Swiss-Prot record:
An annotated GO BP: rRNA base methylation
Binding site for [4Fe-4S] cluster: 84, 90, 93, 167
Organism of origin: Marinomonas posidonica (strain CECT 7376 / NCIMB 14433 / IVIA-Po-181)
CDD domains according to UniProt: AdoMet_MTases
Name by which UniProt lists this protein: 23S rRNA (uracil(1939)-C(5))-methyltransferase RlmD
Length: 438
């Protein structure tokens, strides 16, 4: 007998609580106002510190409530009108309603809280640059459930695609390219065959990656090749089920940093903020201060964003990266820039590999791990026993965890800094220098 499958009903939304008046005292790193009512913490999206607001609880909890903003009775002097018409719906930006200097102060406060066991807020140095038009890479989502053309970014509250007309954090050239691409997609519909789209701007120019989930006709393909030629854009296709397209050296992308040229595959990771990347690399060189008698290990090195600048100054540099394709790109970049003191190794940095570098006399380490941090590799670092460790992180909470472990094992924090790599968003990049204690 065939068993009948029960129909899953969507969860009912909790009814809104009564309208309440709140005095907002603080701000979370996700840009939610922090208030208290009868001693219980309430997080209010869209409310700013110093404001008196009315709001209704929509997600009650045992330890705290979440509420939706109804009205602002007394407005903060730091509140500004968002530049983007999609702010509040699009999940990309969370701080556009807060004046830029106040954004930076809020991020510094949050970072100080994360690192409170290691140093004081006054010790945190800050790097900032432009607050808009900085993003040189964007992944565009497609809504396949609608007949109309819906391209943009995911909603803040769901996986729904917000139909974006303009994005203020994209570079001006990418904004123009996005508008032109939408016109082309309307004229030559291939949405049912598209998984998603990536836009890129680098030293080489503009490019578009179209990731296909099914094949398109030669006529359709030619229409996009013609469009790309008219727009002076390099077009890349990723075929259905293909993980990575093989490219010739001429087809590879490239960007410049520290007077060096780095080639990379369009699917490789690069920092999305060119201005801040230049500043970040320069600061890393200044803090770590590599000399000709230094041997530096660059962990999670990618295609050599830090490795190549290090090799200009140090006696020897070893870059370590999991992906073999990026290791090959790093080697090519070293050769391209004439750096004979730089080598690259493919290794899984979640596994002990200390013996691999035991004969190298490594005295300095730079690491730039993913959001999960580098906890599995810390014992290997401690075994190598470098005099200095420069830790670059996109997740301050895992940085704090890893740094506290290093401090327990003979290191001290010398410097720490916030780098506002992602203005208007809740994300920050952090740099920390640790010194081995004698």
């Amino acid at each position: 007998m065939r068993r009948r499958t029960a129909t899953r009903r969507p969860a009912k939304k909790a009814p809104l609580g009564p309208m309440q008046t709140y005095l907002v005292e603080g701000l979370t790193h996700e840009a939610k106002g922090v208030a208290r009512l009868n001693g219980k913490v309430t997080f209010i999206e869209g409310a700013l510190p110093g404001e008196t607001v009315t709001a209704q609880v929509n997600k009650p909890g045992r330890r705290f409530d979440e509420a939706v903003l109804n009205a602002v009775i007394e407005t903060s002097v730091d509140r500004v009108s968002p530049a983007c018409q999609h702010f509040g719906d699009c999940g990309g930006c969370s701080f556009q309603h807060l004046e830029e200097s106040a954004q930076r102060l809020a991020k510094a406060d949050w970072l100080a809280g994360q690192l409170r066991n290691l140093l004081s807020k006054e010790q945190i140095e800050c790097l900032f640059d432009v607050g808009s038009g900085y993003r040189r890479r964007a992944r565009i989502a497609i809504d396949h459930k609608k007949n109309a053309l819906v391209l943009g970014f995911r909603s803040k509250a769901s996986n729904r695609v917000v139909d974006v007309e303009q994005c203020h954090v994209l570079t001006p050239s990418l904004q123009t390219l996005f508008v032109s691409l939408k016109v082309c997609l309307k004229q030559h519909p291939i949405l049912s065959s598209l998984g998603h789209i990536e836009l890129l701007e680098d030293t080489k120019g503009l490019s578009v990656v179209l990731r296909l989930v099914s094949n398109i006709t030669p006529v359709q393909q030619q229409a996009y090749l013609d469009w790309a030629q008219q727009q002076d854009v390099e077009l890349y296709w990723q075929a259905p089920k293909a993980s990575r397209a093989d490219l010739t050296d001429e087809q590879m992308r490239y960007y410049d940093v520290s007077n060096l040229r780095l080639k990379y595959h369009p699917q490789d990771f690069i920092q999305i903020n060119e201005f801040m990347n230049q500043k970040m690399v320069a600061q890393a060189m200044a803090w770590l201060a590599p000399q000709k008698d230094d041997t530096v290990l660059d962990l999670f090195c990618g295609v050599g964003n830090f490795s190549l600048p290090l090799a200009q100054l140090a006696g020897s540099v070893i870059g370590v990266e999991l992906q073999e394709s990026m290791v090959q790109a790093g080697r090519h970049n070293a050769s391209l820039n004439g750096l004979k003191n730089l080598s690259f190794v493919a290794a899984d940095l979640t596994q002990p590999v200390a013996g691999q570098f035991s004969a190298e006399n490594i005295n300095k380490i730079l690491l730039d791990p993913p959001r999960a941090g580098a906890f599995e590799f810390l014992d290997t670092i401690i075994h190598i026993a470098p005099q200095q460790i420069l830790y670059v992180s996109c997740n301050a909470s895992t940085l704090a965890r890893d740094a506290e472990y290093l401090v327990l094992n003979g290191y001290k924090v010398v410097r720490a800094g916030l780098m506002d790599m992602f203005p208007q968003t809740s994300h920050v990049e952090t740099m920390m220098l640790l010194q081995k204690q004698k």
